[in-house]
Amino acid sequence: GDYTFLIDEAHNLVDRARSMFSAELYKKPMLELKKLFKDEEPRIAKSLGKLNSFMITMRKLTGAEPYYHQANEPKDIYPLLNKFILESEEWLASHEGSESHEKLLEFYFNVLTFMRTAEFYDERYITYVENSKDDTKLKLFCLDPSHLLSEAIKRGKAAIFFSATL
């Protein structure tokens, strides 16, 4: 289109682009929401239970190390996430304003972001799992954002990069 992109802090562009094109999910909210929805909406709780089990499997991949990574994308979680999206959408539409709604909505948007990011997964990505004392993170990590950045910039006529640091 007829756009000119002005990109400030260009010296941080690689890190910012990696972050923009990566996505992560945490195990802890899955378990907390599962408990919250156990009685209120069992279908959502069941869906979250399957996601929680998947995250336990991923956690075990790290062994004694705090992290693990692989080139292959975690395709087995995608059907579980899609099921969660379907189970949640109807409930979210009919329960606005409730305390549970806000908590589920936040996780729902994280899942949507994760699934959108998964569409870009190729040889420039890795699957990264990190364990902390009380949580497990699953991340689709974009190692090389240059292709996606280039595609985004091509949507405009020009791009001007600024950096006071360079």
Predicted regions and their residues:
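Conserved coupling segment at the C-terminus of the helicase ATP-binding
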Residues: 1-166
